[in-house]
Amino acid sequence: MKLSFDLKKKNGNARRGQLTFERGTVQTPAFMPVGTYGTVKGMTPEEVKGTGAEILLGNTFHLWLRPGQEVMKMHGDLHDFMNWHGPILTDSGGFQVFSLGKMRKITEKGVHFRSPVNGDKIFMDAEKSMEIQKDLGSDIVMIFDECTPYPATHNEAKKSMEMSLRWAQRSRDHFDKLENPNNLFGIVQGGVYEDLRDVSIKGLTEIGFDGYAVGGLAVGEPKEDMHRILEHTCPQLPEDKPRYLMGVGKPEDLVEGVRRGIDMFDCVMPTRNARNGHLFVTGGVIKIRNAKHKTDTTPLDPHCDCYTCQHYSKSYLHHLERCNEILGARLNTIHNLRYYQRLMESIRKAIDEDRFDEFVTEFYERRGREVPPLAKEQ
């Protein structure tokens, strides 16, 4: 089913909306937990839903390698396979291929690489990506693109962006040929170069997509460049389509993305950091392994309503971390995912109440920091 996007309110550049799918609604700005292999690591779908998540991200590349398309089709689709019946967005596999480094060779046709699972020679292109994502039953399908590395010269970024545009057209054509009833998002590329981003946006909007992602950021570039590119890019994207910042990020990055007009985010940070004992709280980050928490009988965050904070102390979580107990990673993950969803809930409430600027100020004050200036203010 084609999504509908209802842009309900704006407060400055911050946008408050609702995405409606056949499988449910998603309030925006939204954060999508990452379920790389058909699971948010260590969590049941019910637990993930209990944190407030309304949409998940699945990984086309990894699910293609394991368990494969045939197993997926035996179950129906990814929703049935993992027992998550809300909306799912799947990335196209482009970033994972980019991450393989020397193990892959990129050509106009697509990407040749060796499987990180068993070393087999594999080829992926725009058409294959569209076919896999249709079999996954993805509510939002991402085009196949090349993630421009950082650093890249203007000429390197230009060639990469132009090839991604050609792949975008191929993705659109094959998506339509497959008669996929769901939604296809374009991905803006162009590195840190504003003129290349302009060309990418123009090409993508001429092709026409159900939503637009900003890709090729959070790949090593300075934060100032990411903010500058977002400020330049977002105003040029269609007002009535959702905007998705891929692979971002820290709580501060989510706030800064919303300040610049982003509606959707995903990142492994809350789950990966949880497994490493780095826990997000109102004032910043707690490293639960540190010795000072051994005798601290207070909850992680007195403002948090998650299962972990309602039932366990820092002392207990410290003990689990020191003993490498699986329960520790699970409780940490529940907390971090709930922190991210509470952050998004607070952002949405602030936009609804026309007090987003005040929210941003308070957010940074609790961290003992100044609000970063917008690029146009510098």
From Swiss-Prot:
Any one GO MF annotation of this record: tRNA-guanosine(34) queuine transglycosylase activity
Biological process terms in GO annotation: queuosine biosynthetic process; tRNA wobble guanine modification; tRNA-guanine transglycosylation
Cofactor: Zn(2+)
Cofactor binding mode and count: Binds 1 zinc ion per subunit.
Residues involved in Zn(2+) binding: C304, C306, C309, H335
Family of the protein in this entry: Belongs to the queuine tRNA-ribosyltransferase family.
UniProt protein name: Queuine tRNA-ribosyltransferase
Natural source organism: Vibrio campbellii (strain ATCC BAA-1116)
Gene: tgt
